[in-house]
Structures are given as structure tokens and as C-alpha cells.
Amino acid sequence: MSSHNGIHPAVRVGHVHLSVSDMDRALAFYRDGLGFNLTGDGRQMGLPMAFVAAGDYHHHVGLNTFKPSGLYHVAFNYPDRRQLARAVRRLQDHGYAVDHATDHGGTVAVYLDDPDGNGIELSYDRPRETWFDAAGNPILKADRIPVDAI
């Protein structure tokens, strides 16, 4: 199998983020029906989002009520900040605009749309010990950072 376009072989699909019409109904399906663990509930902070995962990963499925139901974005997880920075530079070198970058606490991500308007997130995870605060709660934040800081 060839490495088409030079993408790092350790890149994985990190998560899928879905826009849902009813958060309680969605959580009943993903948590109760499928058995995912609720790993973060932004509603506790007034944010219309929740995260579920299998095992101890921060999230495999993100749920929000930001826009009409459907795919919000797909995330590709890079092995480290250096590989993420290379991916951003490659996109920019090919004329694609990166919309913004965000520090989520345990994850740093950049966001853009593909040519058809589908949301794309490229991210890397910080070490697991940085994902939680002193009380063991997941750190949920969305601090904008300069794209060139990646």
C-alpha cells in the first residue's frame, strides 16, 4: 500500500461530530442504546454539546445542536503537533484556507471545509494526563489560537 500524497501513516480518524436535533434523544441512543460512555457534557457549562467514547478516549462521537441535524465534521488525528503543522502547511501550500485553530485542552485542532463544504478537523492529542483537571473532570474549552502557532 502506498502513502498517497505523503500523509503520515499514523494519522487516524479521531472522531465524528454530529449535529443532532434533540440532545437527550441522541444521548439515549449513543450512551444507553449503543453503550458509549458519556465523557463530557457541555450543557453543564451552557454549551449545547456532549461527548461519548468507548474506553478512556476523550470522545469518538461529538454531539451538538449547533445547526440542523447531520454531519458537523470528521476529525483526522495526527500523532503529534509537528505532523499537524506539516499537514496545515501542505494545505496552505495547495491553496486551501484553514478557517481557525482551537485549543480544546487535551487536544489542539484546526478547522476547514473541504471543497463540498464538509467540515474537516485536523488535530493532535496532548498527553492523557493533561485531559482532566485536578478533580478528574474533563477539561472542555474552545480557546481560539493563531493557526501559525500550530
For the regions a language model picked out, list residue spans one by one.
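Core segments of cupin and vicinal oxygen chelate
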Residues: I7-A10, H17-L63
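Conserved catalytic-core motifs of GNAT/GCN5-like acyltransferases
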Residues: N37-Q44, S123-D133
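Low-complexity, intrinsically disordered terminal/linker segments enriched in charged
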Residues: G136-R144
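Conserved acetyl-CoA binding element of GNAT-fold acetyltransferases
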Residues: A50, Y72-H73
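Short functional hotspots where side chains directly engage DNA or cofactors
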Residues: S2, W131-G136
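Vicinal oxygen chelate
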Residues: A10-V11, V20-D24, D56, P68-S69, ...
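Basic/polar N-terminal segments that are highly enriched at the extreme N-terminus
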Residues: M1-I7, I150
